[in-house]
Amino acid sequence: MGSLDKDNQDICPICLDPLKEAVSTDCRHLFCRMCLTQHMDKASVSGILSCPVCRKPCSEGVLGDNYICHTHQKRVRRFCEASGHLLCEECLQSPEHQSHTELSIENAISHYKERLNRRSRKLRKDLGNLQQLKAQEKKMLQALQVDCECHRLRTDLQNQDQTKEQLKALPWHWLDQEDLPEEVAKIFSFSEAVTQLSILVSGLERMAKDLDASTLKDASDLLDRSAPQKLEGLLSRVSPAGPKLS
């Protein structure tokens, strides 16, 4: 029986699915944060907020500090895309936000989660292309190393006053040793870009997975940010659309 009770504690009584962002009411019942938020939205029409299970009174504060407007001490209901702020009903009446576009918290989370996932898929494809370019540069470096050995052989022949016919027998397209550092630098640039892009993609995927009202502004800021300049140059070689994150 104890095991059954434990299993029930991991299920939201409203959606009957495993708890997501679990929050506890004043009476200690657990719900998905979004499920309880939607319940409170409906209950606020009547002005009576109560636990969906036992009907005991509960406050909006159980949703957490991030869901309460610190200016008016009321629950936030909308996300302003222009300012990146969470707004309560009183905030929405402010002239500051009259010309702004606001989304409901639920729609904003869904909207930004889709944008984050779409961008991470695009950048993961770019990451694969960068890794291919890095592999190509490595092959070129190996070829240059062989060429340098041949270059040294050519120099030895010159030092030994060999005939022009012997020199002409060697390919003249071989590069000098001074070209090697440039190729090594290219490989380091690609390695650095692959590392940066891997971290960026992982961050986008993690943010999309854990996105909630408290991180909507972070998601908006991240999507509006451009890649570092060095990364932009390398991404432009694999992505004609450009490296902006949004």
Curated annotation (Swiss-Prot):
The keyword Disulfide bond does not apply. Disulfide bonds: none annotated. It catalyses: S-ubiquitinyl-[E2 ubiquitin-conjugating enzyme]-L-cysteine + [acceptor protein]-L-lysine = [E2 ubiquitin-conjugating enzyme]-L-cysteine + N(6)-ubiquitinyl-[acceptor protein]-L-lysine. It comes from the Eukaryota. GO terms for molecular function: transferase activity; zinc ion binding. CDD domains: RING-HC_TRIM40-C-V. Its EC number is 2.3.2.27. A zinc finger (RING-type) spans 12-55. Zn(2+) binds at residues 69, 72, 91, 97. One of its GO terms (cellular component) is IkappaB kinase complex. InterPro entries: TRIM/RBCC, Znf_B-box, Znf_C3HC4_RING-type, Znf_RING, Znf_RING/FYVE/PHD, Znf_RING_CS. The keyword Acetylation does not apply. It is an enzyme of class 2 (transferase). Keywords: Coiled coil, Metal-binding, Transferase, Ubl conjugation pathway, Zinc, Zinc-finger. Disruption phenotype: TRIM40 deficiency greatly enhances antiviral immune responses and interferon-beta production and thus inhibits viral replication. Interacts with NEDD8. PANTHER family: E3 UBIQUITIN-PROTEIN LIGASE TRIM. This is E3 ubiquitin ligase TRIM40. The gene is Trim40.
